[in-house]
Amino acid sequence: LPLVVVELKSPSREATDVSEAYAQLRNYMQEIPSLFVYNAFCVMSDLATTKAGTITAGEDRFMEWKTVDGNLEDARYANFDVLFRGMFEKSRFIELLGGFICCSEKDGKEVKILSAYHQFYAVRKAVDSTLRAAETDGRGGVFWHTQGSGKSLSMVFFAKRLQRAMASPTIVVLTDRNDLDGQLYGQFAQCSDFLRQVPVQASSRAHLRELLAGREANGIFFSTMQKFEE
């Protein structure tokens, strides 16, 4: 059974567009559910607009893939060719399947989430930088996001990839606000199956020390910087 289902609409027919492609995908899900048992994501296109999303995504959550190989200078050219060459090159496709599609919860329902192109390429670079830092000065760098661009999920994807790259390291997430600590912890907790471990919030500096004592691998722990002043 297919891992990806693609629905194409003719650009020469004015009566059909990418919204019709999305509607057709939803029809397939209702009429041929077995086609989507192993589905990773879907693609809809009328050649003018091409987007990818998961079976739980609304039309507004299908996203363009704006670069073939991570070169942001080409990111303004989001088209059919860029998405297919960017997402379906064999090694990148395997990476997407293995570390950039996760399940979470929204309004009490399970949703499947596909990484956006900027998350995919930024996480790869961040992990490479972290590996170099581990061998040199310990400075991995800054992973910068604009508001609303999915930083919480980027951190989840980063943690997943880092687990494989560094043989299951222990990860401590430090923030400077209680609300942000709770937000990030909540996102990681919703993705615990994807991460194959349950994150833990440290209640105090002593608790964090206890969680880390004697640990040689695994574990994702959350704390705030203020706890170090207690």
Which residues does each PLM region occupy?
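ATP-dependent helicase/translocase motor core
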Residues: 1-170, 179-195, 216-220, 226
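Conserved residues at beta->alpha junctions
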Residues: 175
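Short acidic loop-to-helix transition motifs that present clustered carboxylates
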Residues: 180, 201-209, 228-229
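Acidic/polar loop patches that form or flank catalytic/metal-binding clefts of enzymes
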Residues: 195-201
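Conserved motor-coupling elements within RecA-like helicase/translocase cores
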Residues: 203-221
